[in-house]
Amino acid sequence: MIAFFPELYEDELAYSWFSRYYTKSGYLSLRYALDDLYVKRYVNPDTEFVNELRPEVKELVIKHCGMENLILGHTMFSSYGRFLPDAKKQEAYRALLDMNGNFNNLLAIPKNRRGTGRTLRYCPLCVKEDRKAYGETYWHRIHQIQGIQICGRHGCYLAESDVSMERKAAPGLWNAESVIPEKLEVRMCEEEKEATLAGYACRIFEGRMPFKSRVSVAEFLKYRLKRPYGSASGVSLCLERLYQDYREFYGNKNVMTETKMQKILLGKRWNFYDICQLSMFAGIPVEELAAIPDSIADEIKEPVFMQVSEELGLDYELVRSVGEAVLRRYEARERVQRRKRTFAWEKMDEELLPKVRETIALLQGDGMTRPQRVT
């Protein structure tokens, strides 16, 4: 029977909170604590999210801090869910609130790799501050963001603990204070750009989570990259030149592949670290990426699609959906020969406009047949 929970600290992982409860409660066995906390008897406590809690435990959590606050402020949802499309993000959030395991399939987590080869990390300087302020330290969310090796506040390298994040590891509730040593080595990062990126990403991670936006992260990135990397017509980006400059900017260190960048710009990939990396390269302020302004929704309309929309008197969104479908098919065909020659972006733009017109005409019908549905 659980009678109390300790104070929940700022940015503390829910796993850390339950671990401190276990340590302070004097259980004779881990199994007794797991039985009191969780619905499933043989559960392995999740280091990044929350396993299904017993009803009476959930009631205590609600009274203490609220399930919404626990999910938004004390799990890794801000990393894996921040840049998802609105509908998918909302579905994942509901699954997390219900403590339903299918959230793993909804979040932007590398397939079958959540926790693989990773351990809980800590910042030596944050540990010192925690011990001074609270008399103990705890596991911070901000130190567990995949791809970031540096504390965004102090600019020092994060240290690895012995606590595995593997989902198949032996069950445990490892309290940070009992795991992290008293004597700590501090290694400052001397790479200014790497430290700046860590601080940039951490500030976005800590920002308020938007659930409704008129502009997707892919649309926003393309909008901000269009001026320096747009093709002649403005429909597409010169991906090869963009990728080359991006690699040079980061010195080829921890950069994503060109294919992964393309998927992000097509709205098919939502990796938190890679998006932050591309955004910082593009010079986008933290505040704008954390909460993409709705005011630019009308500005991002593609000029070619606007032209077709006005000429044919059709809804812009219909024209855009058809045009993007044509673009994807064209790019897929040309990608096969990319290694053999330079991609002819301007030529592609010239060919796109008539193709979009032809496709829309077919969808509209000839007056005798019904218009086709666009999916």
Regions found by a protein language model. Name each.
Residues 1-375:
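Basic, alpha-helical nucleic-acid-binding regions used in initiation and control of genome expression
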